[in-house]
């Protein structure tokens, strides 16, 4: 099974991805997490350090793929999760999406692509150009990380459009939204009313989730010394269980940008505004 995790930049995709990877490993699966971000920090929470990237390794080997061994690019992380960082070109030069393709090509040459029960792609921000949408070519499911805010849901809608486009030619489905660090879910619910899709989980607004990223530890590792965090781990285990059940998923019908902008902005501009009754509904009630 192959998963692709997307979402607005800074929303907590990598923290979420790492914890889902550990949750899948705790369910007995062999997991590989591939970081698809030039910052190459996707797997930091699993390994505790910035591992060398595939591009760094290929450059050292003068792009002789036959000279690269699995141990050169695959690093063991917490919970037995294997970790790879694609890396990227120098800032302002080259195409990061091309690097993702080279990463998959190398892993296939190493016969590593088919050795895992689950491969999870953690993908750069909300960039949905052809290059960074490449992981959707391989994925069975896409998961979108969001919060209860306007910008994150607007980005989620654009990603949903990419899923719909890729699903035309690939067996790809949207598994659902994951709400990260949010005290409310009312705007999320308003969005999924307009664009029907599952909500896998909504994680609570607790500081430990953010702190785990700084510490370079997953919530599961932190819970070993602080059992009060076990309840947070249960959210990730729930997501893992839902994914392993191979849900039907959806091919989303994204909302037009202007329509969504009006829908979400109206939620803020007119909070608690009573719904205008439908004249036909009023007539029906009178007849009854």
Curated annotation (Swiss-Prot):
Cofactor: binding comment: Binds 1 [4Fe-4S] cluster per dimer.
GO molecular-function terms, A-Z: 4 iron, 4 sulfur cluster binding; ATP binding; metal ion binding; oxidoreductase activity, acting on iron-sulfur proteins as donors; oxidoreductase activity, acting on the CH-CH group of donors, iron-sulfur protein as acceptor
Reaction(s) catalysed by this chain's protein: chlorophyllide a + oxidized 2[4Fe-4S]-[ferredoxin] + 2 ADP + 2 phosphate = protochlorophyllide a + reduced 2[4Fe-4S]-[ferredoxin] + 2 ATP + 2 H2O
Binding site for [4Fe-4S] cluster: 95, 129
Keyword line: 4Fe-4S, ATP-binding, Chlorophyll biosynthesis, Iron, Iron-sulfur, Magnesium, Metal-binding, Nucleotide-binding, Oxidoreductase, Photosynthesis
Keyword Hydrolase on entry: no
Matches recorded under HAMAP family: ChlL_BchL (MF_00355)
The protein's name in its UniProt record: Light-independent protochlorophyllide reductase iron-sulfur ATP-binding protein
Originating organism: Nostoc sp. (strain PCC 7120 / SAG 25.82 / UTEX 2576)
Source lineage: Bacteria, Bacillati, Cyanobacteriota, Cyanophyceae, Nostocales
């Amino acid at each position: 099974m192959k998963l692709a995790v997307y979402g607005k930049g800074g929303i907590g995709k990598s923290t979420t991805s790492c914890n889902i990877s550990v949750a899948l490993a705790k369910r007995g699966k062999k997991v590989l997490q591939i970081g698809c971000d030039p910052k190459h920090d996707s797997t930091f929470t699993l390994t505790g350090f910035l591992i060398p990237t595939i591009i760094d390794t290929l450059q050292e080997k003068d792009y002789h793929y036959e000279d690269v061994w699995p141990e050169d690019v695959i690093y063991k992380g917490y919970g037995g999760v294997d970790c790879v960082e694609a890396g990227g070109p120098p800032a302002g030069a080259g195409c990061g999406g091309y690097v993702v393709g080279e990463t998959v090509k190398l892993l296939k040459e190493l016969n590593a692509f088919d050795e895992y029960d689950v491969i999870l792609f953690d993908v750069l921000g909300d960039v949905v150009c052809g290059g960074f949408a490449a992981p959707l070519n391989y994925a069975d499911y896409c998961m979108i990380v969001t919060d209860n805010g306007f910008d994150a849901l607007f980005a989620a809608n654009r990603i949903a459009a990419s899923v719909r486009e890729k699903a035309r030619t690939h067996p790809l489905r949207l598994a659902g939204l994951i709400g990260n660090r949010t005290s409310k879910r009312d705007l999320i619910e308003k969005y999924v009313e307009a664009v029907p899709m599952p909500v896998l989980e909504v994680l609570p607004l607790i500081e430990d989730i953010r702190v785990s990223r700084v510490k370079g530890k997953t919530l599961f590792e932190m819970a070993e010394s602080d059992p009060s965090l076990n309840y947070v781990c249960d959210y990730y285990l729930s997501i893992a269980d839902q994914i392993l059940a191979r849900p039907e998923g959806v091919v989303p019908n994204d909302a037009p940008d202007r329509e969504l902008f009006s829908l979400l902005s109206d939620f803020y501009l007119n909070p608690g505004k009573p719904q205008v009754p439908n004249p036909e509904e009023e007539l029906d009630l009178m007849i009854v």
